[in-house]
Structures are given as C-alpha cells and as structure tokens.
Amino acid sequence: MSVIAAQREWELAEVAQEVGAEVVCGSSLKANLDRDWDQTTQKEEALSLVLATLTQVESWLGSLPHAEQHPKAQQYLEVARQVKAQDVEKEQEGKATLIKGVAKERRISVEDGQMRHGRKSRSVRVDGDIRHVLHDMDSGMVRAVGVTAANAPEASVTETISADLERQAVTLQELHIDRAYLSSHWVRTRSPELEVYCKAWRVRQGKQFSKQEFHLDWERQIICCPAKLEMPFTPGGVVHFPKKSCAQCPLQAQCTTSPKGRSVSIHPDEALVVELRQRQLTQAGRAQLRERVAVEHTLAHIGHWQGERARYRGLRKNLCDLRRCAVIHNLHVLARSEPFLQAA
C-alpha cells in the first residue's frame, strides 16, 4: 500500500482507510494489534485479523486500474503470500493457526529473501548467512571467502572458493578443516598429494562393542568382528552379521541386543575416517590438529570487523562485504610481517 500511496502522493493512512486495512499503519503491526500474547484466544484473533487484512489488500490491488498497477506492489504481495504459506495452516474446522515446527527453506526475513534458519549443532542455531574463510597457514593471509545461507551445507561453499583459487593459480597441499567440510568436493575428489587434517567423528561408547573393535581389511574388503567372524563390506554400505551366528556367539551380550544380529555402518570415505581417528591418538597428530587454531583466530578477527549482523540484503552484497573485511585482515597481517617492518 505504501507503494500506491507514494504513487498517488497520498498518506499511507489514507490508502489504508480506503482498503480497510488501518491495522498496518503506525509504529508496528504488533503494537497496532495490541493483544495479550500469552492468551491463546487473543493470538488467534490477531492472526485472523492479519489474514483478513491480507485478503482485503489482495482484492483491492486486483481492482486497481492498470495505470495504478505497480510491479513492486505485486512483489511485496508475493512475499506476504510466501510467509502465509510457510507459517499458517487451516485446521479441519477451517480455523487458521500457526504451523508448529519450521518449514523447509523457510523465509526468515521480509527484506532479504535469501536468509534462512540453520544449525551449527543441535543446541546452536544460526539465522541468516554463514561466512567461510580460507586461511593460508604459511602466510596468514586470507586467500578466499564465501557466504552461504544458514540452511545450506557448509561444504557447498568449496566450489566457489575453488574458482577463486584457480584465478590465483593456487594449489591446495594441506586442508585443515572442521568436520562440516569433510563432505566437500575437496575431500571427495582429493588427489593423493592433498593431506587432510580434521578431528574425526566421535565413536559412540556404549555398553556394547564400539565400531573400533571391528577390524577392517582394506585389501580384501573384509570386516572382522571381535569373535573373528568375517563379512564383506563396501564403503557407504551397512554390514549385517547373520542373526543366527550372533545368537550363538559367546560375545553376543557384549556386542548387540538386537534379535536381528549386529550391524556396522561403513562411511563412504571410511579409510579417511580411520586415518583421522588413528592420527589424533598420537601426540604429533594432536599437535597438527591444533594448527587450525590460526583459522579460528582469523574468523574471530574478521567477525570483529564485519560484525555479527549482515550489513546488506542478499548473498552477493554480503559476500562483497566479507571480501572487504578479508582485505583489511590481510593488510593487518602484511603490516606485521617482517619485510614490512624492516622496510619501515
């Protein structure tokens, strides 16, 4: 309505009165509704009023003459429809209620259509975008950066970062990453020369034998259980030991309580997972993992300069802003470098 009001050179309140949508005028919609939000009935009344107002605005826009039709007005109306579709459902009685849970690809910002919900872990939620930084362990410089929506897999950013590295004619020799990037194309399609340093996934330690008690023979593609029963395996598959053998096994109580027998999942890149797990058991391996602290420091520095709130709307503009902060970081690193200090 504000678009049409500006086009007519009217006040928003005048247009709202014509439409019958006075509730949208004022400092905020929530203030105009003025409900006790702890009361279920009042929340339902407020939702019904908002939906009725949206219907009135849709009808009013459709009745406007062609000369007054404006692309932006239709664009804003589509945003409202999207929010309604993802957050509101009708019960059997026909009453509108807010959907419990979060819709897939849920839009979280009216202004920025690319922002999404995401999770770093079960307890840590991220709203908006996630920044990614490629830190050069030798020079301390940031070689490339990336931005993804919060609900996108973090590993998906590596394709665009690789394109930036190609323009710099840079080849990766070592990857010091966290576990979110283990599914990236860098790891999946790595050459034998590329070393990957990452903490391995934790092995569940219950009352029964853990996966580490099973021996993997990579030459024969055979897995051997603690009772010396052998079964073939394939990366990415699940090995099911025969239930009859498990039922007769003297170690059954220590291995499984399932009447179907013991099963073991094999990671698609199980060889790498085993290598990472064995490496972090050694003092030298743990020291190599600690080298990644420099990456976390770089992320903290850039986060300090850029802030935790996106300055712009859209991934492209926020990527540009992240690159700006990476340049500032690199200038600080350069200013602390020995050649620069000697020249000074």
Segments (PLM) and residue ranges:
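Anion-binding and metal-coordination hotspots
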Residues: 1-344
